[in-house]
Amino acid sequence: MHPFNIVSRADIARLPRAKPDSASSGGSFAMEKFATALEMVTEMKPDLPVFAARPHAAGRAARWFINNFPGEVAYAYKANSSVFLLGALYGAGIKQFDVASVAELEDAATIPGVRLHFMHPVKSRYAIRRAYFDYDIKCFALDTEDELQKIIEETDGAKDLELFVRVSVPAKNSRVPLEHKFGISGQKAQRLLVKARQVADELGITFHVGSQTTTPDAYAMAFEEVKKHIVKAGVVVDAIDIGGGFPSRYTDSVPARLSDFIEVIKASMAKMPVTEDCRLICEPGRALVAEAESLIVKVDLRKPGNQLFINDGSYGALFDSAHLGFVFPVRLIRPGLDPNEPLEPFEFWGPTCDSIDHMKGPFMLPASVREGDYIEIGNLGAYARAMGTRFNGYGEYIDVILQDEPMYSIYTEDLEPIARNA
């Protein structure tokens, strides 16, 4: 169960099958637990798509980062705000959260003892004021002088601000480059660092190497850019926030080992012109929760050409597959399935009437897959739940907890046994 006993408004709306847990207080929810997806579909035979959480996987990922990253670990709240995964992260020791909106900070602020970072570089005046005065948030990101002025004005010239200047860095080998919308470069960056230093209690630099970055040299290149800005601006920097970008494993994406990323980050940080007490912060999202949730869908129809029509799609949890081309691992969930049956490539169509509701794949499944079968789509814990809509009236899910292992894991060095009955 969720260790701090909260359920957000969004999660309550998603729990049509949740049952109140009479053994606990505060309105918590007892989700149905199953050993495997096969056990779940055999018992429930769901008509709705099912989000299958594996909180133990989120906890393991959090412990790995806390034990191996040479600094502070803050979770990127936008990746997945499921109450079950947040509980696992919090229970494993994640006590800092990167939020990007008033709604996110309102939800995250209900968690006891957490520290929030408002790292969206462009915020409304209302959001800045709410964050500072109502939620005691001191930490803000920015990438323009105009945003700096907004922060100064809306905090009434506060003297306790932690200001992080977002600089642009190369997005090498990232699946989703992020350097175009946010980030300042060149002399403008150096001028902004100087101006922010004049009003900040703590000055930081932040960057993002891009989402699903598969090679660690991207961080080395980013640190080199940051080093140039610090030297040319001639400022003392109190913190460096390297953002997220840490990868997960997918069918079409096999990244370098996480330990290789950590070694590059350690070596790069050692070369930075900063004091010994300079804070180093990371904000993983995908790497913490991707393995911790999967989606179980039902096949509504099979058409010639290995086309499967399923009950969720691009307007739901499969946005990244449809629009960014991610190929997630899949497996057929059917009692008595022959494990040696040959696999064939399939493409998916979602349930809406829109023709762009299409996931090209290829998704490798047994040749006999048919209407009425269930398919588990794995490693969907990052952004799938967050991207869902109610287009065409779809977007309703069942939530369950599974106690088996995810299809892929990048935490192979963690041999910690799973407490299946916890």
What do the PLM-derived regions correspond to, one by one?
Residues 1-161, 194-200, 232-236, 402-422:
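A charged N-terminal "starter" segment
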Residues 2-9, 17, 169-303, 392-394:
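Active-site loop/helix belt of alpha/beta enzymes
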Residues 53-60, 80, 84, 146, ...:
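Conserved active-site and cofactor/substrate-binding residues in soluble primary-metabolism enzymes
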Residues 58, 78, 101, 131, ...:
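Conserved, mostly hydrophobic/aromatic
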